Amino acid sequence: MTALTGDQIRQKFLDFYAAKGHTILPSASLIPDDPTVLLTIAGMLPFKPIFLGQEAPKVPRATTAQKCLRTNDIENVGRTARHHTFFEMLGNFSFGDYFKGEAIAWAWELMTTVYGLPPERLLVSVFENDDEAYDIWHRQVGLPKERIQRMGEESNFWTAGPTGPCGPCSEIYYDFYPEKGLANVDLDDDGRFIELYNLVFMELNQDDQGHRTPLKAKNIDTGMGLERMAQVLQGVPNNYETDLIFPIIEAAAQRAGIQYQKANASTQTSLKVIGDHTRAVVHLIADGVTASNVGRGYVLRRLIRRIVRHSRLLGINGLVTPDLAQVAIDLAANVYPNVRERQAVILSELQREEEQFLKTLDRGEKLLAEMLSPLKKAKGKKRSQPQLAGRDAFVLFDTYGFPLELTQEIAAEQGIGVDVAEFEACMAEQRQRSQAAHETIDVTVQEGIDSLGDQLHPTQFRGYEELSLTTTVTAILVAGHPATTATAGTEVQVILEATPFYAESGGQIGDRGYLASSDALVHIHDVQKQKELFVHYGKVERGSLKVGDRVSAQIDLSCRRRVQAHHTATHLLQAALKKLIDENISQAGSLVAFDRLRFDFNCPRPLTREELQQIEDQINAWISESHTTHTYIMALSEAKAKGAIAMFGEKYGEQVRVLDIPGVSMELCGGTHVHNTAEIGLFKIISESGVAAGIRRIEAIAGAAVRDYLQQRDSIVRELCDRFKAKPEEILDRISQLQADLKAQQKALEHLKAELALAKTQALLEQAKPVGNSHVLIASLAGVDPQGLKTAAEWLLNKLGSGAVVLATQPAADKVNLLVAASQDVVQRGVHAGQLVAALAQVCGGRGGGRPNFAQAGGSQPAKLAEALELAHSRLKEILES
């Protein structure tokens, strides 16, 4: 058995199967195409549509090294030898081509010949009823019967779900202790055995009754964990000490000033967590995920926060994730070049997220420590495990942004549980409070609709083809309650048999318009969808509307056209962002209204003015190119196969509506759109801003709304011209002159402040005291900003020649600024300004640091300032008089 690097193991696997006629395919993204799946959790996931018969295979045989990420066992990461979040799954796949005989024979050849594993260390399992696989292993491969175990359905039978393709599995295990013999072997003993290779034989189809029948086209799906194979071939005790992860662990240990091999168990666990999670966050960001509070973004945020938390447990202060990520990038770049291409994005996202979390962590840890203190004292007095109240955990989360998972982790370290049920109840109460005000009418309407029971049939929506139609009123609600009649002046909700009105969904607001009968006119100002019913919100303007009336339903054509322009422009905006900024950008929310559009998307940084202009220019170019739009109804699997963009978290039926702008954009969309991009006319970006961590927002206008916007801007320019008595082209110069005058006055004011600070500083010089062979000056200054503090320290140190200066100021009631400066000879005698100011800041409830000769810090407890300055005096005296 020859030791191989992780890269060599991966390449040998791919080369072996390529020689067996397999096409080597690149790893799919960690963001799967399937909008119902959060992350790519298995090597077979990219091929799932093929295995389910939804897509035809492009090749009969394939082999991959697939990036995967799972968080279901995140608490076990670092605590066991083999649990990971991020891992690589090596696999070979057959789509109706070869089957069990070849799959088993090749797997054995790979393990024993290519990787050189001793046959006497290998055992296999088969499904208890799979005689065919058993015979292949025994008779064709020649494996002794005592090395083949039949196992039950729970461990050795794979299903895609309640129905669909399924089949038995066969697994290859490595024995770390063959000297123990084969009597009473338990393959689940992970201290002795490690599962290396899993072969799935998809040969059956399961119906909704649980009956299984043979498949015509039988498939092979296999998986080998790269990290596990590396552990075996590199002869290390766990996956973390392989060359795939250990360099990250070593980098973290070096930052902490410790040696991994000499560290205790809890320290090693923290280092393993850091190593594992760092790989995960690098690949998540490289594949387009940004930190947020939902979905994949929350997975990323949680992993980053766990890295920071475990780094703090090791005593690592300051930013840590960018440095560790650089190690992970260097390890992966040769195989996954996108981590190098997106290196700047990865490091920037990690720095931003870590800096944000450190603010949360400091405050949250202090509050949590106060909450846990009485529980720790009571722990020995109670037989049951003490629990932190869920309401307290909720306060930490809701008020201070401290994650529940982190509260649980810190509490568990001290043997304390958390009442998660109460926490969830508090969350539910908060959601109800926040939604109650604007949901009252909707809830009442929903109750009114429910009370009508089966009297109502789903509304026929015909608004794609018809803008007006004659239909029947099937229900009327007044104040949310069913009614038979509504008279003039009454606010109503009307349900029709059929409607041309679009109901609000997918970010697009509902149509406006009117209903007219021989006796009534109803103005419709909103349309909402309740279950399968379209509820038209309006007001009876004249006459009397009755259930059973025949009415003419007419949408407001002007409003519909404005909405259509904004909706198609939204699709163009997403296409432009993907083309010009990052192909991994995806929608996080949207609003399509009559007067504007709003588009939220994942992006770790603000867009520049130049980028926004490029986006605007690209969209207007597409508009002027007069692209015809096409809508299609097709199967969801077909739409995904064609590359249509779906929004994660949306639930889609088997049949979906697709808007295609050939060569520009293809998205799943149920909204209304222009027939040709030229109908949009013009597109204008109004603003770009951040709405949450990792989420940016663009607000824009299109079509007639641009005309309104330009008229308004023209009015503003005319008003400025009148005020400045200037022509439009002269206004900027006038404003620049005003700014220059203001800047000159501010500069003069700063000069006066500096002179005042210098006068105060000169008076301080007399307070310097001799300590050892140097002078020490410790003082507090009033009315001086940090820059003034720095200027004063430099002047004083220059006058002292040899010595140390410690200055403090209190710029606000709850704020302290501290500064330590030292001459070079004093530094050589052992004074370190950065370490000293950190100690002083800690006394004042803050933090900071810096160079040996100069450092600044801040604190939040001015009452402790005198104590901090006394500490400075004693520390300097101790060093300089020794």
UniProtKB/Swiss-Prot annotation:
Cofactor section = Zn(2+)
Q: Which GO terms describe its molecular function?
A: alanine-tRNA ligase activity; aminoacyl-tRNA deacylase activity; ATP binding; tRNA binding; zinc ion binding
Q: Which UniProt keywords apply?
A: Aminoacyl-tRNA synthetase, ATP-binding, Cytoplasm, Ligase, Metal-binding, Nucleotide-binding, Protein biosynthesis, RNA-binding, tRNA-binding, Zinc
Q: Which CDD domains match?
A: AlaRS_core (cd00673)
* UniProt-annotated location(s): Cytoplasm
Q: InterPro entries, per this entry?
A: aa-tRNA-synth_II/BPL/LPL (IPR045864), Ala-tRNA-lgiase_IIc (IPR002318), Ala-tRNA-ligase_IIc_anticod-bd (IPR018162), Ala-tRNA-synth_IIc_core (IPR018165), Ala-tRNA-synth_IIc_N (IPR018164), Ala-tRNA_ligase (IPR050058), Ala_tRNA_ligase_euk/bac (IPR023033), DHHA1_dom (IPR003156)
GO cellular component annotations, sorted alphabetically? Answer: cytosol
Q: Which domain of life is it from?
A: Bacteria
Q: Where is Zn(2+) annotated to bind?
A: 567, 571, 669, 673
What EC designation does it have?
Answer: 6.1.1.7
Q: How is the cofactor bound?
A: Binds 1 zinc ion per subunit.
Q: What class of enzyme is it?
A: ligase
GO:BP terms for this protein? alanyl-tRNA aminoacylation
PROSITE patterns, sorted: AA_TRNA_LIGASE_II_ALA
Q: Which reaction does it catalyse?
A: tRNA(Ala) + L-alanine + ATP = L-alanyl-tRNA(Ala) + AMP + diphosphate
The record's section on HAMAP family has: Ala_tRNA_synth_B
Q: What does this protein do?
A: Catalyzes the attachment of alanine to tRNA(Ala) in a two-step reaction: alanine is first activated by ATP to form Ala-AMP and then transferred to the acceptor end of tRNA(Ala). Also edits incorrectly charged Ser-tRNA(Ala) and Gly-tRNA(Ala) via its editing domain.
- Annotated domain remarks: Consists of three domains; the N-terminal catalytic domain, the editing domain and the C-terminal C-Ala domain. The editing domain removes incorrectly charged amino acids, while the C-Ala domain, along with tRNA(Ala), serves as a bridge to cooperatively bring together the editing and aminoacylation centers thus stimulating deacylation of misacylated tRNAs.
* Protein family: Belongs to the class-II aminoacyl-tRNA synthetase family.
**Name of the protein described by the UniProt record:** Alanine--tRNA ligase
* Gene that this sequence comes from: alaS
